[in-house]
Design a protein with these regions (language model features):
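Juxtamembrane "helix-exit" motif on the non-cytosolic side of transmembrane helices
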Residues: 2-4, 81-94, 204-208, 235-248
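Juxtamembrane membrane-water interface segments that cap and precede transmembrane helices
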Residues: 2-11, 91-94, 168-183
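Hydrophobic alpha-helical transmembrane segments
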Residues: 11-23, 173-196, 261
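Alpha-helical transmembrane segments
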Residues: 18-26, 64-82, 226-230
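C-terminal transmembrane-bundle signature of multipass membrane proteins
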Residues: 30-33, 227-279
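Membrane-interfacial, low-structure loops and terminal tails that flank and connect transmembrane helices
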Residues: 35-64, 206-219, 279
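Interfacial segments of alpha-helical transmembrane regions
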Residues: 124-144, 210-224
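Transmembrane alpha-helix/helix-exit interface in multi-pass inner-membrane proteins
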Residues: 144-164
Length: 279
């Protein structure tokens, strides 16, 4: 029947999703009634008058860019490894690579650390739009938290015991947050990644207002090519990969997904680094 905590969390998430749908419906209904008042508001006019960011670089409009090729190459290699790794590689390689706290998870933590360093350096050196600098600083902090989460805050590196607070609510008995309450935090991470990495770039590309809004508040948004990379990474689950290939190695799909998402965020950091250099 599965873990009771996971089942309880799943029921809660379904109820929360229904609630969000009702809220979204209410907001949409309100906008449809008072849209004239909204577009005449000073806030809307201020956002609409912002120049946006597509005029700065056409690179973010490209689909087949470096971010697309790198993220999809990583995804393709991951699928090939799952399908054929057990046939061509010895267990002395596949076992430490795929186990919990193995090489893949350690590499994911290293990539998140690089992301944090890149964003911290960008925030330190950037002297332009203040909101942009604030988001760069926030991203640097968030990715540093991701490093701690991937390493269970040093639990396996330094041999810490699982905290008493985590016992019974962490499904893997680890000192981290993303495995609490039946993977609820992990599900939030997946949903947040898909919204930020896929939905926001599409809104930005399709509607000039969203481009101006994101630019006005200083939010870095992935390119269209990277959005497809986020989509492929976020859809890497047992129920999707299992349809494509038969697994030949011991490797958690969740660990592979986190690794691919880490690569996508690294490409985002490099896109920001390139974009902020442009005049």
């Amino acid at each position: 029947m599965g873990d009771p905590l996971t089942q309880q969390t799943a029921r809660f998430e379904v109820a929360a999703f229904r609630g969000l749908c009702f809220v979204a419906a209410g907001v949409s209904f309100s906008v449809s009634i008072w849209w004239r008042r909204w577009i005449a508001s000073p806030l809307f006019r201020a956002i609409d008058s912002h120049p946006g960011s597509y005029h700065v670089s056409s690179g973010r409009r490209k689909i087949l860019n470096a971010s697309f090729y790198i993220t999809f190459t990583a995804w393709f290699i991951g699928i090939l490894y799952i399908a054929f790794g057990g046939y061509v590689l010895p267990t002395s390689i596949t076992t430490p690579l795929g186990r919990s706290e193995g090489y893949l998870e350690q590499l994911t933590a290293i990539i998140f650390l690089v992301c944090s360093i890149v964003f911290a350096r960008l925030a330190w050196c950037y002297r332009g739009h203040r909101p942009t600098r604030a988001f760069l600083t926030l991203f640097a902090f968030v990715f540093l938290v991701f490093v701690g989460e991937e390493t269970s805050w040093g639990q396996w590196v330094f041999g810490f015991e699982t905290s008493g607070l985590m016992e019974g609510i962490n499904v893997q008995d680890e000192n981290n947050l993303h495995n609490l309450f039946g993977y609820a935090a992990d599900h939030i991470f997946i949903a947040g990644t898909m919204i930020y990495g896929v939905v926001l770039p599409l809104l930005r590309f399709c509607y000039p207002f969203w481009d101006r809004l994101f630019s006005a508040i200083g939010l870095p948004v992935p390119s269209l090519g990277l959005a497809l990379g986020f989509l492929a990474s976020g859809l890497t689950h047992g129920w999707t990969v299992g349809v494509l290939v038969e697994q030949t190695v011991v490797l958690s799909k969740a660990e592979l997904r986190e690794f691919l998402v880490a690569i996508a965020f690294l490409m985002l950091a490099l896109e920001c680094r390139t974009g902020l250099r442009q005049p």
